[in-house]
Curated annotation (Swiss-Prot):
Lineage of origin: Bacteria, Pseudomonadati, Pseudomonadota, Gammaproteobacteria, Vibrionales
InterPro entries the UniProt entry points to: Ferrochelatase, Ferrochelatase_AS, Ferrochelatase_C, Ferrochelatase_N
UniProt superkingdom: Bacteria
Ranges in a coiled coil: none
Pathway stated in the Swiss-Prot or TrEMBL entry: Porphyrin-containing compound metabolism; protoheme biosynthesis; protoheme from protoporphyrin-IX: step 1/1
Function: Catalyzes the ferrous insertion into protoporphyrin IX.
The protein's name in its UniProt record: Ferrochelatase
Keywords, in A-Z order: Cytoplasm, Heme biosynthesis, Iron, Lyase, Metal-binding, Porphyrin biosynthesis
Family the entry assigns: Belongs to the ferrochelatase family.
CDD domains: Ferrochelatase_C, Ferrochelatase_N
Pfam families according to UniProt: Ferrochelatase
Organism: Vibrio vulnificus (strain CMCP6)
GO terms of molecular function: ferrochelatase activity; metal ion binding
């Protein structure tokens, strides 16, 4: 990297509750679900629903789910994010900080820490391979809001997406092959991506196109037939139609189609978190086996794998 003494990297992810408690989860969900990028419903209608119904009911339930995946060092998302930070900083030999769109440390915290180290050019890497306004767009909003609060605005390089980057695809393929080597190869590889409302895609969000492209490139890299791999969408919320096919419904239907041994990967998540560890690894396995499946293999996120750190470094140095 050129000018490493003045250039730094800001890794941006969604964020996480600070504790696996109902109050902490409530604070986090309140900030997250207040974002109009996430829920675009009219505020006067949405806010009473959010504060009167959703937060009081969901916060204790979600807190209990977090407790099932919480690590000694804290939230999995934060633990793996910090490991990424350390590894990438060593790889690039330049300052690397973390900034979360919601919760702490915030994007502003990350910018302030970088500037305190003399950084005047920041490469912002939102760790969302596939672009969506609900994630990368929200990260950009958080960055813009943060820059309003600094005395000197640094030069910014913003990486919008990397859904088709060769090193990203190779890193995914490597994780699949490692799983096959250790656990055996299933009849089918299911690529489960976080969903968004179908209406958002209808209004121009390119997210499903990026997801489909990632799956196709992974298929080609692994040499799979189109009948051996598929794309689904998880984590839907509310009654509105979301991107389909739904992951949970697919898991319930695959055994009846003769698929008894299943591999599941979550390419849209750069680190393991509640949605991968609890929803896919635990609930997903239970659903698949209950429907008649026999073997269910969850493939962890790329996290701080060397191939993932190498890809992140390349994304930064290419700019």
């Amino acid at each position: 990297m050129n000018n490493t003494k003045k250039r730094g990297v800001l890794l941006v992810n969604l964020g996480t509750p600070e504790e696996a408690t109902a109050p902490a989860v409530k604070r986090f969900l309140s900030q997250f679900l207040h974002d109009q990028r996430v829920v675009d419903m009219t505020r006067w209608l949405w806010c009473p629903i959010l504060h009167g119904i959703i937060l009081p009911i969901r916060s204790p339930k979600v807190a209990k789910l977090y407790q099932t995946v919480w690590m000694k060092e804290g939230s999995p998302l934060m633990v793996y994010s910090k490991r990424q930070q350390v590894e990438l900083q060593a790889k690039l030999n330049c300052p690397v900080e973390i900034g979360m769109t919601y919760g702490t440390p915030s994007v502003l915290d990350g910018v302030n820490k970088l500037q305190a180290q003399g950084v005047d050019e920041i490469c912002v890497l939102p760790l969302y391979p596939q672009y969506s306004g609900t994630t990368t767009g929200a990260a950009y909003d958080a960055l813009a809001h943060a820059l309003r609060k600094v005395a000197v605005v640094p030069s910014i390089q913003f990486i919008r997406d990397y859904h088709d980057h060769p090193l990203y695809i190779k890193a995914l393929a490597e994780s699949v092959r490692q799983s096959w080597q250790v656990q055996g190869k299933g009849d089918y590889l299911l690529c489960s991506y976080h969903g968004i409302p179908q209406r958002y895609a209808d209004n121009g969000d390119v997210y499903p196109l990026h997801c489909e492209m990632t799956t196709e490139l992974l298929r080609l890299e692994l040499g799979l037939d189109k009948s051996q791999i598929g794309t689904t969408y998880q984590s839907r919320f509310g009654r509105e139609e979301w991107l389909q096919p739904y992951t949970d419904k697919t898991l319930e239907s695959l055994p009846a189609k003769g698929i008894k041994s299943l591999d599941v990967i979550t390419p849209a998540f750069s680190v393991d978190c509640l949605e991968t560890l609890e929803e896919i690894s635990e609930q997903g396995q239970e659903s698949f086996l209950h429907a008649g499946g026999e073997q269910y293999r969850f493939i962890p996120c790329l996290n701080d794998a060397p191939s993932h750190i190498e890809m992140m470094a390349r994304l930064v140095t290419e700019r």
